[in-house]
């Protein structure tokens, strides 16, 4: 196990109807003038936004709204939010929604006190200060409610980049599983897929002797298989949604990623898909992850994939041919994704195989490699996209 520091200061408020306490927590963490960031009309139609605004008013907090956040959140609304915060002298940002809303709120939060372009922080500069952010979560998926990360798409360049710093961890997050019951089944399935991706990307490591976090990660994956099936059968199953919501936070606040090398190639490969084709992030991951796993199994990564197959998917270990076990586990994962309605091919997300050379270039690999478990050069990216497209894998 590697040396590590771990800092996770977010205060979590979990359970039914806990969003009614939001105003109290905003005040507790120093807010007096609040920007409420949300997505589309669902927050208004459901009455959630009105309830949030009412509880802020009960605490004598000044609040203004900024709606219109879209999936794969764009830079344009971030600039708009920064200007609004400065005009209104905002001192606290409240995100009401899922990961896209929270990531937008975080980007605004680091942009307000900064004299330059907020995109600097999505191009390598590390933020050192931010307005405080709180969240009311409505979609279990990204884990942004407990993470130090934000992902934004630059509308001009179509770059989909991330910023990371402890100042981006929310002060508090309200998690009411009942708020996710109105989600379309497809969106719920995309969230399940994203949660599993965050778990896998910590699981696939070359760091030895990390049994505690191995077992924690395997436990989350097993729970997602079970609860994912339960919520697909009964979308109003509160307990299934509660477990999924908590898994989304736990798998991405990095308590299960400490002391070990991680591999984020699946997300890296997917980001250009959702940036170019505007597909749901979870859908893109469902297409990319099995292809990435298959590539790893064929290029020296079969041992841990076989462990996953046995411990998570219940496959029998073939000690004479671990790769066979690994491939069996990958097929079991694909079958699960299909069972919850996820796409598995380029065609199903509207991606064109003819664009693969462009997708590879969008990843800005150069002559280097990405990832940790199995390093991927430009040819490897090309091969994985072709596997995801159902093509053979010719050389570039």
Name these PLM-found stretches:
Residues 196-200, 241-252, 289, 333, ...:
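Short alpha-helical scaffolding segments that buttress acidic/His motifs in well-ordered protein cores
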Residues 1-92, 346:
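ATP/NTP phosphate-donor binding region
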Residues 113-209, 303-307, 311:
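A glycine/threonine-rich phosphate-anchoring loop and its flanking beta-alpha core
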Residues 308-396:
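C-terminal charged capping/lid subdomain of soluble metabolic enzymes
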Residues 202, 206-331:
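Active-site segments that bind and position negatively charged phosphate/pyrophosphate groups
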Residues 51-52, 81-82, 101-114, 146-147:
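Short Gly/Thr/Asp-enriched flexible loops that form oxyanion-binding sites at enzyme active sites
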Residues 90-106, 138-144, 276-279:
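Glycine/serine-rich anion-binding loops at beta->alpha junctions
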